[in-house]
Amino acid sequence: MTAHTEKLGGRLPLLDPLALSAAQKEIYDRINATFGPWAASIDFQARTGDGRLIGPFNPILYSPGISSSFLDLHDAEEKYTSLDERVRQVVILSVGAVWKSDYELYAHSAAAQRAGISENAIRTLTAGGLPDDLSEQEKIAQRYAREFSAKHRIDADLYSAAVHAFGEHGVVDLTYLIGIYHITCGLLNSFDISAPDQRV
């Protein structure tokens, strides 16, 4: 493993896929079967050349019991959410901007571009701003994600606007999504995990 590869783990050593426990190997295979093809399809790096997982996926391997349930929640959000993909990516980038989480912004800039969000809007979102070329619903999602992430509360006017835009079911889904990416950014920032390049 090169010095550059070692840095991709931040404070945690990148786990060798040939030295995993049975429980870790189950999580590793699950990530490779789901996130691996997704990462490849939108052109961001989720593992090294020798198969070590990077980004949030490496710390996820360290605690397979809890991580299995976290991945279940992530999968359920993707499967059952009432939010469209553009709104989801606006929310995820807005959370990442508050956390200043380089890898999350790197990966989801690629996902946002695939969802049809303009490069200018992506740059603005990753800087913590509100792009002009979003829909009104997307702008409300950005404001909600940013306010909740920064202040841990939503004021009454913004809550009313969110319910008008998404319905109560949609606001619950919005809140679940924000929470999932608080955990993701927390893993990345706790272990000082950076992006593998300077895309964001």
Where in this protein do the model-derived segments appear?
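Secretory/endomembrane lumenal or extracellular ectodomains immediately following the signal peptide
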Residues: M1-S82
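Transmembrane-helix boundary/entry motifs in multi-pass membrane transporters
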Residues: S21, G167-E168
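A short structural micro-motif
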Residues: F35, E77, A97-V98, G128-D132, ...
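N-terminal hydrophobic signal/anchor transmembrane helix of membrane proteins
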Residues: S67-D72, V90-A107, V172-N189
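Helix N-cap / loop-to-helix initiation motif
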Residues: L83-D84, G116-N120, D155, G167
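Histidine/lysine/aspartate-rich catalytic loop segments that bind and position anionic ligands
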Residues: S109-S135
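Acidic/charged, solvent-exposed loop-and-adjacent secondary-structure segments enriched in E/D, K/R, S/T
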Residues: A145
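Acidic, carboxylate-rich catalytic segments that either coordinate divalent cations
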Residues: A161-H164, G170, G179-I183, L187-V200
